[in-house]
């Protein structure tokens, strides 16, 4: 009887450890701003890209900041449609030695503080070759810290025929695009999230 109880106790402990391990993997942090500066928790650094690469005149600035008590990456700028331009973006390359494999996750989680404007989240994968191609999803960010969850199913390919392969993520970008406006978006956390089994 004693040995049976011991076996039962061991099984309980092992199952608890397994549940804890699975729960710890429900979110994979890519950047929580703990590295400081423009460096991400993933190791790569954020960089500013504007439509100047194609002759546009939009102006942008990317910096580390603190907004409402939280350390964040801050993207600011004025988006202009002149010269067939129209975007500023904060881009994080995630390929490193190999592309980021997000196949086991449901989508991307953002903790952001904005200015009431609509922004895009763009993904580039190994299937994306041309600079204007990306998989896009939109979100609106009010002037308050809040969490945005964007499922991978919400992304649409822009000028690309291949379906989104989240197993080969090479870049994630926060983008102000498509209309003339003043951008001001702060990011405190970027992560991959996994929906709980049986959850919504």
PLM feature spans:
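Beta-rich carbohydrate-recognition modules and glycan-binding surfaces
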Residues: 2, 19-200
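Bacterial N-terminal signal peptides
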Residues: 8-18
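Bacterial N-terminal signal peptides that target proteins for export
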Residues: 1-9
């Amino acid at each position: 009887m004693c040995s049976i109880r011991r076996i039962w106790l061991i099984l309980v402990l092992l199952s608890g450890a397994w549940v804890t391990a699975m729960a710890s993997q429900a979110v994979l942090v890519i950047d929580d701003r703990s590295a400081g500066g423009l460096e991400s928790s993933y190791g790569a650094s954020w960089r500013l890209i504007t439509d100047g690469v194609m002759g546009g005149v939009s102006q942008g600035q990317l910096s580390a900041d603190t907004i409402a008590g939280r350390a964040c990456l801050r993207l600011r700028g004025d988006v202009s449609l002149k010269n067939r331009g129209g975007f500023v973006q904060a881009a994080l390359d995630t390929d490193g030695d190999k592309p980021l494999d997000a196949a086991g996750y449901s989508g991307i989680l953002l903790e952001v503080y904005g200015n009431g404007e609509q922004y895009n989240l763009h993904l580039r994968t190994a299937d994306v070759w041309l600079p204007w191609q990306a998989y896009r999803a939109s979100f609106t960010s009010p002037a308050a810290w809040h969490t945005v969850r964007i499922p991978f199913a919400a992304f649409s390919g822009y000028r690309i025929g291949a379906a989104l392969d989240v197993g080969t993520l090479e870049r994630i970008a926060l983008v102000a695009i498509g209309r003339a406006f003043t951008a001001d978006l702060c990011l405190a956390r970027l992560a991959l999230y996994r929906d709980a089994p049986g959850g919504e």
